[in-house]
């Protein structure tokens, strides 16, 4: 079975109990009355509370999964639980939405935003149908970080079409200079975008033909951005992820980073939503 031929979607959403993750759960279930969602939350109690805020008709199509993406043992246990559920596997899509925001150390930020994304991909992608989709939630902070980091070698490494996992992990190990420690969030998202490209190169060919992309949801008002000038409701943050999940495979890229307006964007500089989509030097 392929994602294109499957009769309904079964999508795993991490960080699903609030903010953009919760809005994605609602959007997925509203889009198709036969769709199912695996609602992955770090706290089972908070996940249950969020579940009860949804209409009863939606609740019947949700599989609650307790999972802390920053914990290898938690992710492993969650995979074991989900793999035993024939009603919610195989998956047609994975949305890596779980994340932490500004003001934390590089290690703590990347533990969730980068390593957590990588861990979920490696663990749950074997449950995807052929032609399944992976959407990694990134941020404009990633390109913004690269545009001002002043390190041309790092920019080249993280935007290389053929970036390797070894290179990405090497950049992480090098970390940030002392005067850039406030850029931990943007740094983590630049790693997510590079990993997205690496993973796409690895999985885009048959037999699995998995489509992997990343996107920014836009500047959305969530717990992460409260008090920082964000005003857009979480519901406005689902546009790009939904586009990457459901648009015909011939109409989207592979390993690309998309803006909140669903247009391709560069990895090393900010593109204003509504402006011309990015094209690299090969026009692809």
Show the residue positions of the predicted features.
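C-terminal helical subdomain
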Residues: 119, 214-217, 222, 227-284
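Catalytic loop of short-chain dehydrogenase/reductase
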Residues: 99-107, 130-206, 216
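Rossmann-fold cofactor-recognition segment
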Residues: 54-73
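Canonical Rossmann dinucleotide-binding motif of NAD(H)/NADP(H)-dependent dehydrogenases/reductases
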Residues: 2-38
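Conserved hydrophobic beta-strands of the Rossmann-like cofactor-binding core
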Residues: 10-13, 90-95, 134
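Conserved Rossmann-fold cofactor-binding substructure of NAD(P)-dependent oxidoreductases
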Residues: 69-89
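Active-site Tyr-X3-Lys motif and surrounding loop/helix of classical short-chain dehydrogenase/reductase
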Residues: 77-80, 104-111
